[in-house]
Amino acid sequence: MIEYDKLVRDKIPEVIEASGKKCDIEVLNDEQYIEYLNKKIKEEVNEYLESGEIEELADLEEVLRAILVAKKVSYDEFEKIRISKVDKRGAFEKKLLLKRTYTDGE
């Protein structure tokens, strides 16, 4: 037996059972769901950082979308927030690395 205690995609129980194994599943309440989504997004970021694979970014996007739904924020609303931040602060297109800040005389 392997213990997991992690949020999985909706079809994973069927995939496990199709492989001849059994699994125990718990349906989370809304508060638990957000907590486990937050853990999941960290997991997906780490998987992307380790592998560099675009497929991991797709997983990250899926978790991000689930968080938005759980927080009752539409993807369009989220995109407006993103664009507003780009308008005010820019994006990451110029590949700028801030090394230090200082005032005259420092």
Identify the role of each PLM range:
Residues 1-106:
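Flexible "arm" and connector segments at domain edges
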